[in-house]
């Protein structure tokens, strides 16, 4: 897609959660037709899409069939639990997979993206090792020093992750990783525990033609591997930002294609001596980047769609301090409702997005509060207050 093409275009989303919903809205504003695909009916992007399809996303034949039936101009993976081998086949047939089928395959496996970053590109990462049994995990963890972080090589949203304080916790960590892992392989990555001052996402935009662009860095807090709040712009020194941008450019150049990537880093070390450490990468809009709906002239979703379609991005501009705070469910329920919107939306410079998920479970992200402020502190306080006002009701 290196030359101008007529509109409307047809985009297929593989994964139709809250991030896919915002991609669909951004695409439709440009007159595009959107096909939303997911494993369950009523996924957030489906009500706003032109067509909805429900398939087993890890079933290669089902994935090939739905893509060939619609033959979209662009296929945009929005989740990690996909039949990636089928994407490679479809790409070979001429289907435009975003950013590339290889990028999707590499980044869904923590071992492959870590080997690329640390081994192939020489980026600074936490010290790490792999293990394929509890016994091997114990042997691999000890040289890293305690505590260590254990993660399945394939999982999402923090599933299966744990911090292990010493040898006595290895068996439980292995069991947790296997329970939270995706796929059939029994493999984990074990990392040294980094005592970091800040965790950031650098949204990186690769264009078909034109330079790689960067959004202002986003600070965020995670619990159990899942995003809880984010703010923009995060405060980094000029040198630190330059290092992060160089790392992000190196890894996204290697993965190729076009679109927006969420590249995560840790900032570690004594004040004034912090170093930037590569953590992970998603080849798609990032959950921490929901804050860009309040904090930028073009949100991460607008940027992704423009980059994918080869449209110009003249400027990425901050609109001032902005923050987000997630709205979580606390119980399991087949139906949900909400109260407290009046209280939440009374917070100045705030907005609330409810994702429209059809059911709830403890810890499931049901919405997000966004806010702007004169300062980052004020923006974060407003986002927190707005989120606290919304209550997820799981019974009538």
Q: How would you name each of these model-derived features?
A:
Residues 1-108, 112-115, 135:
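ATP-binding N-terminal substructure of ATP-dependent carboxylate-amine bond-forming enzymes
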Residues 306-396:
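Peripheral (often C-terminal) accessory segments that flank ATP-dependent C-N-forming ligase machineries
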Residues 242-263, 282-334:
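Active-site "cap" helix and flanking loop/linker of ATP-utilizing ligase/carboxylase catalytic domains
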């Amino acid at each position: 897609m290196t030359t101008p093409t007529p509109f409307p275009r047809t985009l297929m989303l593989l994964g139709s959660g809250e991030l896919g919903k915002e991609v669909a809205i951004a695409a439709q504003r440009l007159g595009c037709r959107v096909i939303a695909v997911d494993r369950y009916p009523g996924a957030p992007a489906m009500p706003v899409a032109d067509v909805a399809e429900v398939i087993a996303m890890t079933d290669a034949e089902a994935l090939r069939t739905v893509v060939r039936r619609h033959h979209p101009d662009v296929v945009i993976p929005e989740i990690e639990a996909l039949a990636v081998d089928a994407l490679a086949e479809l790409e070979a047939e001429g289907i435009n997979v975003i950013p590339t089928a290889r990028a999707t395959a590499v980044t869904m496996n923590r071992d492959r993206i870590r080997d690329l970053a640390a081994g192939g590109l020489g980026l600074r990462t936490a010290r790490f090792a792999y293990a394929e049994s509890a016994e091997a995990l114990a042997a691999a963890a000890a040289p890293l020093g305690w505590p260590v972080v254990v993660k399945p090589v394939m999982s999402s949203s923090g599933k299966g992750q744990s911090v292990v304080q010493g040898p006595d916790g290895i068996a439980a960590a292995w069991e947790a990783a296997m329970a939270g892992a995706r796929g059939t392989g029994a493999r984990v990555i074990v990392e040294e525990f980094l005592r970091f001052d800040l965790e950031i996402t650098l949204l990186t935009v690769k264009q078909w033609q034109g330079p790689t662009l960067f959004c202002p860095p986003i600070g965020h807090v995670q619990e159990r591997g899942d995003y809880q709040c984010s703010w923009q712009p995060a405060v980094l020194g000029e040198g630190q930002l330059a290092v992060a941008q160089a790392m992000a450019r190196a890894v996204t150049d290697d993965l190729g294609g076009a679109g927006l990537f969420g590249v995560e880093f840790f900032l570690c070390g004594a004040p004034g001596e912090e170093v930037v450490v590569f953590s992970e990468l998603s080849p798609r809009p990032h959950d921490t980047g929901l804050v860009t709906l309040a904090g930028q002239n073009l949100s991460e979703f607008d940027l992704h769609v423009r980059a994918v379609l080869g449209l110009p991005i003249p400027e990425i501009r901050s609109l001032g301090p902005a923050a987000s705070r997630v709205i979580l469910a606390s119980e399991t329920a087949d139906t949900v409702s909400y109260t407290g919107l009046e209280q939440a939306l009374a917070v100045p410079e705030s907005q609330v997005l409810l994702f429209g998920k059809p059911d709830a479970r403890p810890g499931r992200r049901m919405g997000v509060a966004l806010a702007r402020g004169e300062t980052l502190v004020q923006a974060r306080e407003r986002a927190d207050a707005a989120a606290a006002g919304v209550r997820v009701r799981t019974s009538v």
